[in-house]
Structure formats: structure tokens, C-alpha cells
Amino acid sequence: MQIKRITEANLPTPWTNFLMIGFEEIKTKCNHIALLHGNMSKNTSILTRIHSECLTGDALFSLRCDCGFQLQSALSHIANEKCGILIYHRQEGRNIGLINKIKAYSLQDKGIDTVDANYHLGFEADERDFTVCVEILNLLQIKSIRLLTNNPNKVNVLTSAGILITERVPLIVGSNPSNTKYLYTKAKKMGHLLNNK
């Protein structure tokens, strides 16, 4: 086990009230949170979003990506369903870190796409490790989910780790002139499913 449950508190939001649970990685001391809403024991397949940290999109309202739009849409979906979980996965910039993400943005300003910018900086296209997310689901005794994602890799990783995914729920929001190339690259080079299927 790489992670432990530390604390919890209520979190009122514009969408609904959530129970916010704080987790800590044992080796790195990195913190992650899970937002829970509704009665998990009464639902056989929990609507779930694994949302990787994006300071620029989530907190600064950047139009360069669709992250902030996805975060808000996921919280709204969970509120409407009256049950669900959002794991806020603290791996900024597909786990290259904030400063390297800004460096990648600088390269994108020069015409390099989001994947090649990572390669240029010495990283893989996606450096994220979803092991912690699997452990959070296991600690919360959630074994069957409906996953809010456009990323087939998340589906594969969670399925391989023993999480039953009964449905992939598309989360296609936030397209705008500033992120058209970014979204095209995610679909073409990273296999993201952006056609609502």
C-alpha cells in the first residue's frame, strides 16, 4: 500500500455538498483528495472521475486545455446523479510538474504540440501513474465504477488493476479556439476519444 487515509471534512460547492477525504502517499508525502457525494453502498457502479491536477485550467481558468471545464462538468454530473466520486490526482501537467508544464507551454507558443513539447523536455507524452487512484478506490471499497473519461488508457489501467468499469462516460466540454490544436493532438497522438462515443 502506497497511500493512507488522513482526514476528512465537508466541502460545500456550487453543485452540491461533498465529503472531502485527504490521502497521503507514504513515501513521497504527496497529498491527494477524493470528493464523495451520496450513498456509495446503495449504488452498484459508482460514477467516478479521476481528475489530474491542472492549476492553470482548474484555478486560473486557462483556455489552453479542457481541464477546468472537465472538472466543473464532472462535479455537476456527480451532483445530478446524486452519487459519485471525484479523485483529485496531484500529478500536475501529466506528472511533469508545474514549471515543466510552463516550459511546455512556451514550446507550444512556438508551434510545437503538447506531446512533442513533452518529448523535447525529456518526458514521455504522459508521465502519470494511476496506481494511487486505484489504491484510493480500494481504500474506499469501490470495486465497480462508471468512469467519466475520454482517455482509454485510464480505462485500461484501472481494469488491469481489478477495478470493474461498467461504462465509460464521455466528458467532452470546453472546446474553444485556444485549445483546438491541443484537443486534436490528444485525439490523434494519445488516443483520447473526443467524438462523444
Curated annotation (Swiss-Prot):
It is an enzyme of class 3 (hydrolase). InterPro entries: GTP_cyclohydro_II, RibA, RibA-like_sf. Zn(2+) binds at C54, C65, C67. It comes from the Bacteria. Its EC number is 3.5.4.25. It catalyses: GTP + 4 H2O = 2,5-diamino-6-hydroxy-4-(5-phosphoribosylamino)-pyrimidine + formate + 2 phosphate + 3 H(+). The active site is at D126 (proton acceptor), R128 (nucleophile). CDD domains: GTP_cyclohydro2 (cd00641). GTP binds at R49, I50, H51, S52, E53, Q70, E92, G93, R94, T114, T149, K154. Its cofactor is Zn(2+). GO terms for cellular component: cytosol. Keywords: GTP-binding, Hydrolase, Metal-binding, Nucleotide-binding, Riboflavin biosynthesis, Zinc. One of its GO terms (molecular function) is GTP cyclohydrolase II activity. Pfam families: GTP_cyclohydro2 (PF00925). Binds 1 zinc ion per subunit. GO terms for biological process: riboflavin biosynthetic process. Pathway: Cofactor biosynthesis; riboflavin biosynthesis; 5-amino-6-(D-ribitylamino)uracil from GTP: step 1/4. Belongs to the GTP cyclohydrolase II family. Homodimer. Catalyzes the conversion of GTP to 2,5-diamino-6-ribosylamino-4(3H)-pyrimidinone 5'-phosphate (DARP), formate and pyrophosphate. This is GTP cyclohydrolase-2. It comes from Wigglesworthia glossinidia brevipalpis. The lineage of its organism: Bacteria, Pseudomonadati, Pseudomonadota, Gammaproteobacteria, Enterobacterales.
